[in-house]
Regions:
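Non-heme di-metal
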Residues: 1-254
């Protein structure tokens, strides 16, 4: 990734690192970010395929879903191969995120499932547009980001339309509940991008870098920038009430 997207950029720890240490750090952070993206996309596929398991496979919407899943699986394979090519690896997630993933796959309904995944897609889209344009980023990452940005634009448009369509038919109570659950899910996704195990694997003291990340205003600014398109969409569609705003602020996304 570009150095500016590292949660540690501008901190005392960052300033004390050599260039090779910064490269190793940002490559590990890319692996963490993309690992969360893969986990999120697989969860959505499981939820949608379960809902369509008994449907007529010749239906146009089911065929479209098959195409979407095929694309997402190719993206996941691409990211796995890219992370391997730069000498990094994926890191184990926190157990709370795995529990949330189980809930997401099992009970998330349409606008909630698409809303949480759209949050991740929108945030990664902003990040990857920077990464693919920077000479500071490893060539395999730049190529993968370019492919993903181009192909994912159709998926994001589809997710937005699915959310809009569902919102037409739902009650005020369901809209209120969905708004809060989307916010809570997005909060967990955003927080999962910071993985204690990854920093400790690099030999960094979490008791030092954890507070540095929490206090890093540059990191908060970059995350808010990444979330801007998603927050604007929520505002337009009436999915941004007082409670949701509070959660997004806690996530450094608003």
């Amino acid at each position: 990734m570009t150095p500016e997207w590292s949660p540690l950029f501008g901190t005392a720890t960052w300033d004390s690192m050599t260039e090779s240490e910064r490269v190793r750090l940002t490559r590990s952070e890319v692996a963490q970010f993309l690992g969360v993206g893969i986990w999120l996309e697989v969860g959505l596929q499981v939820a949608l395929l379960r809902a369509s398991h008994s449907a007529d496979p010749a239906r146009s919407d089911v065929k479209f879903l098959f195409n979407e899943c095929a694309d997402e699986n190719l993206h996941s394979l691409m990211f796995v191969n890219v992370i391997d090519s730069i000498g990094s690896h994926f890191y184990r997630r926190d157990r709370s995120l795995d529990f949330f993933g189980w809930l997401f796959r099992t009970i998330a309904w349409d606008e909630v499932a698409y809303g949480i995944v759209l949050a991740g897609e929108e945030i990664f889209d902003v990040m990857q547009r920077d990464w693919m344009a920077s000479e500071d980023v490893a060539a395999p990452i730049r190529r993968a980001c370019y492919i993903h940005v181009v192909e994912e634009s159709r998926h994001m448009a589809y997710a937005r339309q699915k959310i809009r369509t569902r919102l037409i038919k739902i009650s005020r109570v369901r809209r209120f509940i969905s708004t809060l659950i989307i916010a809570m899910g997005t909060h967990l996704v955003a927080k999962s991008l910071i993985n204690r195990r990854m920093y400790e694997d690099l030999g960094l003291d979490w008791k030092v870098v954890g507070p540095e990340i929490d206090a890093n205003e540059h990191h908060r600014i970059m995350f808010r920038r990444a979330a801007e398109p998603f927050i604007e969409f929520l505002s337009r569609e009436g999915l941004l009430n007082f409670g949701a705003r509070w959660i997004y602020r806690k996530s450094n996304l608003l």
